[in-house]
Amino acid sequence: MFLMNLLLLIIPILVAMAFLTLVERKMLGYMQLRKGPNIVGPYGLLQPFADAMKLFIKEPLKPLTSSISLFIIAPSLALTLAFTMWIPLPMPQPLINMNMGILFILATSSLAVYTILWSGWASNSKYALFGALRAVAQTISYEVTLAIILLSVLLLNGSFTLSSLITTQQFTWLLLPTWPLAMMWFISTLAETNRAPFDLTEGESELVSGFNVEYAAGPFALFFMAEYTNIIMMNALTTTIFMGALLNPLNPEMFTFSFTLKTLMLTATFLWIRASYPRFRYDQLMHLLWKNFLPLTLALCMWHISLPVIMACIPPLT
């Protein structure tokens, strides 16, 4: 039964991820006043399947100087971790209702750093290594703010369980009292998933393609799938934390509909940002985090900690 539930979670994620690649290409196309893919199938709807078939029937490259075992493990581990992060996410019922669901997601996303590092190092190419080192520095840096923002929001929630966020947000979204944190969280998730304008890891003009420069065919497709799965996951997490849908036990389908709609809107915003903004310089990226986001998130975290203490002497309004 558990295996069946697991498949019912993974297969829709794979389908969503496949069509996200198509939506991105279509959206960028229309924003650049062109059509995007429109040949394979009606309106180009079968394009993701054609891409997948092309990539998986090609012969994978194994560079002579690479460390083969790490070179092959890295992409498969990246996709496995991308799927693992969905386990505690309530939609409205999680696959496994963990007591520390948020910590599990943070820990798993931290492990994803290793896949990038391994792929860059095992490729034995200077471009791949530079791309991997950039990606690792960027991901580790932005995880600091993600963790502090989560702590601040969870002080309002009173629990590390993701399901309790639904109960907390029955009357109002947490986005309203914590909107500065939500804005910083959204920008940090952009950096965490290596999306434009923070896609420094694959700066074409300087690093060719970043940490996956030596990958082709199947292993490259696995990295690609992991990236897009992470994008949907991060937006689903943002929806759960800041824009919790109302759960009516008599009609749980409405929760899923609302949850999906908000996740789609956030994902469309990710793609819109990619179409609109140029890439940051690396020093600007680090300056934004360590000089701007970190002091602000720490100050707001202190405010959230001290607020209940300040308000403790005020009698409740009955």
From Swiss-Prot:
**Topological category with respect to the lipid bilayer:** Multi-pass membrane protein
Write out the entry's keywords from A to Z.
Electron transport, Membrane, Mitochondrion, Mitochondrion inner membrane, NAD, Respiratory chain, Translocase, Transmembrane, Transmembrane helix, Transport, Ubiquinone
Provide the catalytic activity annotation. a ubiquinone + NADH + 5 H(+)(in) = a ubiquinol + NAD(+) + 4 H(+)(out)
Query: In the Enzyme Commission scheme, what number(s) does this protein have?
Result: 7.1.1.2
Compartments it resides in: Mitochondrion inner membrane
One of the GO BP terms on file: aerobic respiration
Q: Where are the transmembrane segments?
A: 2-22, 68-88, 102-122, 146-166, 171-191, 217-237, 253-273, 294-314
Q: Which GO terms describe its cellular component?
A: mitochondrial inner membrane
Enumerate the InterPro entries for this protein: NADH_UbQ_OxRdtase_su1/FPO, NADH_UbQ_OxRdtase_su1_CS
Question: Where does it primarily localize?
Answer: mitochondrion
Keyword Chaperone included in the entry's annotation = no
Gene Ontology MF: a single term: NADH dehydrogenase (ubiquinone) activity
Per the record, the domain of life is Eukaryota
The record's section on HAMAP family has:
NDH1_NuoH
Q: In UniProt terms, what function does this protein have?
A: Core subunit of the mitochondrial membrane respiratory chain NADH dehydrogenase (Complex I) that is believed to belong to the minimal assembly required for catalysis. Complex I functions in the transfer of electrons from NADH to the respiratory chain. The immediate electron acceptor for the enzyme is believed to be ubiquinone.
Q: Which family is this protein grouped under?
A: Belongs to the complex I subunit 1 family.
The name of this protein is NADH-ubiquinone oxidoreductase chain 1
